[in-house]
Amino acid sequence: MGSLPANNFESMSLCSQNPLDPDEFRRQGHMIIDFLADYYKNVEKYPVRTQVDPGYLKKRLPESAPYNPESIETILEDVTNDIIPGLTHWQSPNYFAYFPSSGSIAGFLGEMLSTGFNVVGFNWMSSPAATELESIVMNWLGQMLTLPKSFLFSSDGSSGGGGVLQGTTCEAILCTLTAARDKMLNKIGRENINKLVVYASDQTLSALQKAAQIAGINPKNFLAIATSKATNFGLSPNSLQSTILADIESGLVPLFLCATVGTTSSTAVDPIGPLCAVAKLHGIWVHIDAAYAGSACICPEFRHFIDGVEDADSFSLNAHKWFFTTLDCCCLWVKDSDSLVKALSTSPEYLKNKATDSKQVIDYKDWQIALSRRFRSMKLWLVLRSYGIANLRTFLRSHVKMAKHFQGLIGMDNRFEIVVPRTFAMVCFRLKPAAIFRKKIVEDDHIEAQTNEVNAKLLESVNASGKIYMTHAVVGGVYMIRFAVGATLTEERHVTGAWKVVQEHTDAILGALGEDVC
């Protein structure tokens, strides 16, 4: 018999405490909660966008991991001194960039419960509560959105639909595209995969293109159909129909359409009903991506934006964007779960069990790409229970109200203009050419380019101040500044203050331009 090397005994003596000692977990856990509570109490004081340079952290941290244990107190000191300065503070009330990643006490504590239990719910048997809670909360949220019953689980099995929690929209789109692909190839033969065509607008999330690549779609057959200001950058059903007919004439096979409710660039809304009508003429799978704006559709006044969803095949929204649930939590509903399962299921011997064989349970591993899966439903359950439908609607409406307030402030300053209509809680605006060029005579083809350049300088100046953070988009060749309200801590005073910051930096930039603009 051999013996353990001496250094093994040395390592054991250095850390004799069990890594899951309940008393130590309680002590350190309280410290972390206090630390985060203090962070949120003071988050408004930090520069919203990080001020560090690339590679800053490598200069601060050791080149190798510690040999001996370090205390949680020391680690938290390093978090304060080294990590927080390198964070962009998405939960700051002065964060108006990208789309929100709205947090909440219920979301954080639900995440804590999920992580604390640390179960791996790939099938029903591996943790029945994780599977069953997920199917329940997906039905709850589907009912809040008044989704058709065909998208929900039914107790009598009359519906073939249901919901699943994915990590992100990227995963949801890839899963549905894979299901659509296999369903079509079973009809026309797998040798015809290069004929399959995927459709979207030029405003659709870039994740669709990545999903198409992964799913083996010929890159030439990924078609981003042009939109215009005439339709507020929504996809035209006529443009879709003419594109499809041209493809059929060329011997291609229309497969998949991704329509969007609330595009990333401008929150444009594709006309769901008319697009579905066109798609169904050609047997196309329709996925509705409502990653951002879907949450608002629990409010009756916004529900009409998803009218026509009954004719779609799948629908998704990100609860981690504007529904007070921590990343990651993408809600996906499908009408035909069998197609999803057929495309994604595996059945290795070591996962076989009586519950699965009975066909009376859901094995969510067959509804997603990965095998392992997190207990995401716990945090969504806590959010739904802790706030209730009434309060969730109130929170969402307050963000829309603040966006309207910001829009009103823009309207009172004739140097600015709204570029696209505000639909939800994001305002897209820019400095007008007239404010930049004043009475200078400028070549028409230079006006937009120089206007875009000045607006880009304005945005960078504002963001560099650290007082607020916004991002930009370009639609129809126009550079615009996006002001997205949605951080949980944001109040009207923050919106008013943000506008004052924009005006101050505008004054400085226009003053510097002086009479030199040409």
UniProtKB/Swiss-Prot annotation:
Tissue occurrence: Predominantly expressed in the roots.
PROSITE patterns linked: DDC_GAD_HDC_YDC (PS00392)
GO cellular component: cytoplasm
Residues with N6-(pyridoxal phosphate)lysine modification: K321
A matching Pfam family: Pyridoxal_deC
GO BP annotation list: amino acid metabolic process; carboxylic acid metabolic process
Keywords of the record: Decarboxylase, Lyase, Pyridoxal phosphate
Top-level EC class: lyase
Cofactor(s) annotated in UniProt: pyridoxal 5'-phosphate
EC number: 4.1.1.28, 4.1.1.25
Family: Belongs to the group II decarboxylase family.
Role description: Marginally higher substrate specificity for L-DOPA over L-tyrosine.
Subunit-structure text: Homodimer.
The name this protein goes by in its record: Tyrosine/DOPA decarboxylase 1
Gene that this polypeptide is encoded by: TYDC1
